[in-house]
């Protein structure tokens, strides 16, 4: 199998390539049926989280160009399905024929592993626990920050309206919830009751939870609802520097949560379609230098240290924590905080 790790990848990029299909199919809608590979015409479906669409829109043609240069006569197209991370995982579990999944928390892929759709030990199949890049949670506020929001505790003040994705269905929303909770624990010396009091106040200031991260962005930026959007750093930069200019500002909290974006091949699908090698190559290429450069240019923290060093100015130094170190593994996190009747539900009921 061809290896695309940065140290081993040497193939030159060619100018001729087939365009990637960039169809966005939200969770709950039927994506186009993928035909089985005949060795010459290959179609992959990538089921991904909501705000990853901008990265994969540019990544797919990059991969196609490279793969086709190494496999003359082969035509590759990539289809995309985007939505809340957990909704996407459920769609795959319920039959969405995705060759690969690219999520923003490991529990969503663990669900597929438990159902026998993804190989056991999937995090060891690729470098960096199968997460080619990371992000963190920040605040996006309106120009000049009229509510003077500087840190998580400011979100609990009266008169502040917050927009986030739904923590029950979206990794984006879960990281927002856990970021606030982790800040509460740190600033109260681990006092659970006080941390929950802070988070309950923040939830009280959140009138509605959007289905996914991009839906939350749309509500905040286009519908002009809310004073602050809690979202991934890359999404906040996309809005403030690429989508609009001069309308929004990014606020980095004093203590925030880091977020890995793990990926995996859906074995049950690729075995049926005969797309194993291409699907594997598609994920391996995420660690190539061109893909890592692309990630950094879109404000995703690359794993390649040389690429990260070149983009150091784009990533402020942050005091951050991982959800695993603060709250235990994702199995425990999901059961304790986001299962029906869990801490999130109990705190939301206080709204």
Model-derived regions, located:
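Short beta-strand->loop
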Residues: 47-49, 141-143, 161-188, 202-206, ...
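N-terminal segment of the mature folded domain
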Residues: 35-169, 312, 343, 348-351
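C-terminal motif of bacterial Sec signal peptides marking the signal peptidase cleavage site
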Residues: 15-16
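A bilobed periplasmic-binding-protein/Venus flytrap-type ligand-binding module shared by bacterial periplasmic
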Residues: 136-145, 260-277, 294-299
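Sec-dependent signal peptide recognition
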Residues: 2-9
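Short helix-loop capping/hinge motifs at secondary-structure junctions, enriched
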Residues: 144-150, 169, 182-190, 269-277
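Ligand-binding pocket segment of bilobal, Venus flytrap-like solute-binding proteins
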Residues: 187-254
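Extracellular/periplasmic juxtamembrane helices and adjacent flexible linkers that interface
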Residues: 270-351
